[in-house]
A protein has these predicted regions:
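Bacterial N-terminal signal peptides
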Residues: 1-10
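Mature catalytic domains of secreted/periplasmic carbohydrate-active enzymes
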Residues: 16-433, 442-458, 469-480, 485-486
Length: 488
């Protein structure tokens, strides 16, 4: 299909200081001529709706955001004094000696996750209780005050070494809410928290993702609260390691809005939701929040004053709780399959929590379930029934492309992918099959695609040909992959 050439009338707007113009895209492939691409942010100014739609199509991720999206599977490790006290939120009064993982083996954590296909492991270096899993200089509420390894242990360092050993990326969760710090609620606490960020980003090598929770104590009556200095925290992170993506209360990755393991029917990465650290009243859309069902449709764009490349992360635990509890069991394989379709298959990255037990090991049942999950993914998404489906192609609104399908091969999953290095553009799609070359049957339709869209069919099918129609798109749609798979 011929590439459409689109020539834009100038639109008054302010964008990020990094953009791509004159046919030089982030992928190095030919794209629309004379096109300006906005990286991560664009101010819509006084643009009309059609101009906003066009600008949304030219909003693209940073290289770090793009890499993050391609990981697809990431793992959370909730591990601290709560593992022994049985609490989900510790209160900061714990005796450090309660932390005593006699068989701690971070190699087991990382090896298990690597074998299951995960690309990053995220450790709760500090949860709300304030207990630090590294020998911080900022507080005595840490592993250095425990009897574990005679106070010389360092969980973060152990995990760093395991990640290096197995080729896994390291992420760190650091709670700004600290129920142990006596200075919490005062300006001195901001200094303390920045010092903790600095230690983590200077002592432990490259960190790929930093996860900042938004809880501050306001939900518990009588608990001190704090107004977090998010711009200062984010500056500290980016000054120390510019490539780090910051999640949830950061400005690179947003919380999907639930802990049920599912994305939206229309999951946009270019959204009008302002990232938490920015705090710019001029670009806030009234009523729009992380839990809103729609963050980027044309209806939202009509009210938007700015747009952000702010992709979704789906965080969910393999058990009912985030921390280990002996009376809980891992979710079934069928449930994990559903979560995969609703997260990775809905233009999001899955952050699956697997909590170590009091030994310091991932529980045997969880290890078995992760192995089953990884095997299912590999077996399901290895053999694409579409012939030539992995080639890049473009389509304007209403245009289609047909593909041959491996004869006689069953499939029950449709996969579509956009080249999001050039933005997210598809607003409505339809997928049809034919067995005789003339009678077409619709088997899937939807709104957004993004990095990856998976549609599970009710019944396995065979076909001679497949047709993908981009019914509506913002500028020219850039498809990178079309697939039909059989998932048991």
């Amino acid at each position: 299909m011929l590439l459409m050439l689109v020539f834009m009338a100038p639109v008054s707007c302010a964008a990020s200081d990094k953009f791509y113009a004159d046919n030089v895209p982030p992928t190095g492939n030919p794209i629309e001529e004379n096109t300006e691409y906005f990286e991560k942010f664009v101010d819509l100014g006084s643009a009309t709706l059609e101009e906003k739609v066009d600008m949304a199509a030219r909003l693209i991720p940073t290289p770090a955001q793009l890499e993050w999206q391609r990981w697809e599977l990431t793992a959370f490790i909730h591990f601290t004094v709560n593992t022994w006290t049985g609490q989900e939120w510790g209160d900061g009064t714990e005796n450090p000696d309660v932390f005593n993982p006699g068989e701690l083996d971070t190699d087991q954590w990382v090896r298990t996750l690597k074998d299951a296909g995960f690309k990053l492991v995220m450790l709760t270096a500090k949860h709300h209780d304030g207990f630090c899993l590294w020998p911080t200089k900022t507080t005595s509420h840490s592993v250095a005050s425990s009897s574990w390894k005679d106070g010389k242990g360092d969980v973060v360092q152990m995990l760093r070494e395991s990640c290096d050993k197995y080729g896994m990326k390291l992420g760190l969760y650091v709670s700004p809410w600290d129920r142990n710090a006596s200075c919490y609620g005062t300006p001195e606490y901001d200094d303390m928290f920045v010092a903790q960020i600095t230690e983590l980003l200077t002592w432990y090598g490259d960190v790929a993702e930093m996860w900042f929770d938004g809880a501050n104590g306001s939900s518990i009556p009588g608990t001190p609260t704090h107004t977090f200095d998010w711009p200062r925290y984010m500056k500290a992170v980016k000054d120390l390691q510019p490539h780090v993506v910051t999640a949830i209360m950061g400005d690179d990755i947003r919380w999907v809005g639930n802990e049920a393991g599912r994305g939206r029917e229309q999951e946009w990465s270019s959204v009008a939701l302002q990232p938490a650290p920015l705090k710019n009243p001029a670009t806030v859309v009234s009523g729009l929040e992380a839990k809103s069902a729609d963050l980027g449709s044309r209806d939202v764009l009509s009210r938007a004053k700015a747009l952000y490349w702010y992709p979704a992360e789906v965080d969910v635990s393999i058990r009912n709780g985030w921390f280990y509890h002996a009376d809980q069991q891992p979710k079934s394989l069928e449930t994990l399959k559903q979560i995969y379709f609703a997260s990775v298959g809905s233009n999001a990255v899955l952050l699956l929590n697997i909590p170590p037990d009091t030994r310091g090991l991932l529980p045997d049942a969880d290890v078995q379930r992760l192995g089953e999950f990884g095997t299912w993914i590999r077996e399901s998404f290895t053999d694409n029934r579409v012939i030539g489906g992995d080639g890049a192609w473009q389509a304007a609104s209403g245009k289609s492309r047909e593909f041959d399908v491996q004869p006689g091969q069953l499939f029950n999953v449709v996969m579509l992918q956009e080249d999001i290095a050039r933005g997210q553009r598809v607003e409505r799609f339809r997928v049809e099959i034919t067995s005789d070359g003339s009678t077409w049957e619709t088997i899937a339709q939807g709104i957004t695609i993004g990095h990856k869209r998976l549609v599970k069919l009710d019944t396995p099918r065979t076909a001679r040909n497949l047709r993908v129609t981009i019914e509506q798109t913002r500028r020219t749609a850039n498809l990178s992959n079309v697939g039909l798979y059989y998932a048991k």
